Structure formats: structure tokens, C-alpha cells
């Protein structure tokens, strides 16, 4: 049943409201998680394919993304949103995450999200590398990267690197499919290989010529999911 229902839910842990999309109707549910500066509807081609296979999909706009309010967000809020959605809509058969959404899915699994398998597409890996790359693109001085890390650790406690994807991968027991494009300019394909190296059960699929976003609509990649 191809019907999309939009709702708002409160994520109590972060005291923010997010917009959520239910697509289809089934007892078998899949959670879809968009990436940085993305929105829930970005994964629509994947949702269409899953619908044909009898799954219902739940996607959402993270705080400050898509139709959700706010002017800033960080991965901790993505993870809190995933865990709140599981409470209200779970259990999910599996989870699919793109880019920062892939990192968030692995971290949510580390924090006890219960899924039978996960798919991560164009996922980032080491947080300090991502920050350093961002600082470089903005042509800021490298010490800003250290300041950002110190600010994060002072505010949230613990080490920032604990949220890196490879660290979450080490704690992940379920099978994970890692999909990444060789020509991804936003996130190097090295991230995929390093994440896979730290997973206990994994498959890797490397595409070519699709970059960071087109991969979400690629038939071959979608068929593998």
C-alpha cells in the first residue's frame, strides 16, 4: 500500500520535535536515516523498493533538517531520534543509513537499537578526520579542529572518537552491508574499508561514478539492499 503519512514526534532526550514519515503498511518495518544536510525523503527510491518487498518504512527529518524545526544539529541528536522512533514504532527488521545517517545507525546499534541487519551507504568514519576536512574546506586554521573537539568533549563528556563509525563497528554483532562509491568526493572510500575491517559480519559493495548522493538512486545498489 503506497501511502505516506507525515507525523510529528517529541524526542524527549533532546527536547526537540521531529517530523516522521510512515510509508506503506506492514508488520515488517525498516528504519531509513538520512545524512548531513539531507532529509527523510532522500531515500525514497530505497523505500519504494522495500515497499514492493512487503516492508513498511519509517524515515524522519533530523532536527534542523527538512521539515523539522531548529537551526543546528549534531550526530548525538540523530542517535537520540533513532532510539526514540524505535521506542514508538519498533521493532525494526533492519536499518539503512546514508552518510552521517550511517554513522548514526552504527552508534544507535552500539546503544542497543535492536535490528537484524544494517546497511550503511557513503558513511563517514573517524570524526576528527571529518572535522579536519570541514575546517580545510572552509580554509580555517587547523587548530579550530582541536577547539571543536575540546568543546564537544567538555559539553557531552567522553571522547569524541568514541562516536567514530569504526568504534561502533567493533561493538556491532549483526551483519552489516557497507556500500560506498569510489568517486565519493564528500567521504573517501577509505572510510568504508576501515569500517568493514572492524565489523564482525559484513559485506562490502563498491560502486563507481555515482558520488555521494546519486548512489541513493542506483538500481544495483538498491537491489543489493
Predicted regions and their residues:
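N-terminal cap/lid segment of alpha/beta-hydrolase-fold proteins
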Residues: 1-24
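Alpha/beta-hydrolase active-site loop
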Residues: 72-93
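Conserved alpha/beta-hydrolase
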Residues: 40, 47-69
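Catalytic histidine-centered segment of alpha/beta-hydrolase-like enzymes
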Residues: 210-220
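Short beta-strand/loop motif that positions the catalytic acidic residue
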Residues: 171-173, 178-180, 184
Amino acid at each position: 500500500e503506497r501511502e505516506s503519512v507525515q507525523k510529528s514526534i517529541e524526542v524527549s532526550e533532546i527536547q526537540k520535535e521531529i517530523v516522521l514519515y510512515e510509508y506503506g503498511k506492514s508488520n515488517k518495518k525498516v528504519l531509513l536515516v538520512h545524512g548531513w544536510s539531507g532529509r527523510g525523503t532522500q531515500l525514497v527510491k530505497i523505500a519504494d523498493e522495500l515497499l514492493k518487498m512487503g516492508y513498511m518504512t519509517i524515515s524522519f527529518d533530523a532536527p534542523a533538517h527538512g521539515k523539522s524545526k531548529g537551526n543546528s544539529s549534531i550526530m548525538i541528536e540523530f542517535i537520540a531520534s533513532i532510539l526514540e522512533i524505535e521506542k514508538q514504532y519498533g521493532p525494526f527488521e533492519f536499518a539503512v543509513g546514508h552518510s552521517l545517517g550511517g554513522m548514526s545507525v552504527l552508534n544507535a546499534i552500539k546503544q542497543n537499537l535492536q535490528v537484524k541487519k544494517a546497511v550503511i551507504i557513503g558513511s563517514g568514519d573517524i570524526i576528527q578526520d571529518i572535522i579536519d576536512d570541514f575546517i580545510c574546506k572552509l580554509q580555517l586554521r587547523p587548530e579550530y579542529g582541536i577547539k571543536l573537539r575540546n568543546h564537544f568533549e567538555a559539553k557531552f563528556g567522553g571522547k569524541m572518537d568514541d562516536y567514530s563509525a569504526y568504534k561502533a563497528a567493533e561493538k556491532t554483532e549483526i551483519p552489516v552491508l557497507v556500500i560506498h562509491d569510489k568517486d565519493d568526493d564528500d567521504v573517501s572510500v577509505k572510510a568504508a574499508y576501515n569500517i568493514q575491517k572492524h565489523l564482525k559480519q559484513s559485506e562490502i559493495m563498491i560502486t563507481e561514478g555515482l558520488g555521494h548522493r546519486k548512489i541513493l538512486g542506483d538500481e544495483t545498489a538498491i537491489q543489493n539492499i
